């Protein structure tokens, strides 16, 4: 059976105590005096931080993998260095959207040190035909491969995420391709219809308690319980409000992905 994602809506990281031997006067007369201490070696000058790589497209740039108007964006934070693997999230937009709409997450990419791949859906939304084997999943694969070939990505923190229609597709495809994407982020998603299940990805689900487009009782609450029953590691967050997503919810998802402490925005 073909599942079609057509829901509207997209919002909006000792000093060691010196060892002191209590030496009394009598002991001092009968013990060999200790050898003088060796003076400490001079401190080495601080090494300069690794410089940026000249061939890395820092900031936002086009994916450059589609001949059509629908392509997508790649965001590389200024903290990226070729010598250090960095977490990555493929972030999917909502209904009738563009990858460029994920620019709302670029500040979080800088804050937490995450590469963002933001492709455009092939049509008005994701998965309009043969989910799992459609043009969308092939394009997502090509976008991810380009990032992996050109950047040093952390293989232990590879996420597929999204909001609204993108969240439903991310949850479905993340479960189907859990041997590639070991983390899934679903925010205000309305569908979970994997064509198969591979691997055991960790999952972050967040949903608004008064979401009228994708009611929580039939989506977030239901999905998280089913996934927990199936043995998945699920982090679940409910937030007050409707289909729009508070910035702190997305911030918590990035903290979860990177393993860094979560602090609400001031």
Model features per residue range: what roles?
Residues 205-207:
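Short beta-strand/loop motif that positions the catalytic acidic residue
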Residues 49-79, 83-151:
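Serine-hydrolase catalytic machinery in alpha/beta-hydrolase-like enzymes
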Residues 239-245:
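Histidine-bearing beta->alpha loop at or near hydrolase active sites
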Residues 156-199:
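Primarily recognizes the serine-hydrolase "nucleophile elbow" in alpha/beta-hydrolase
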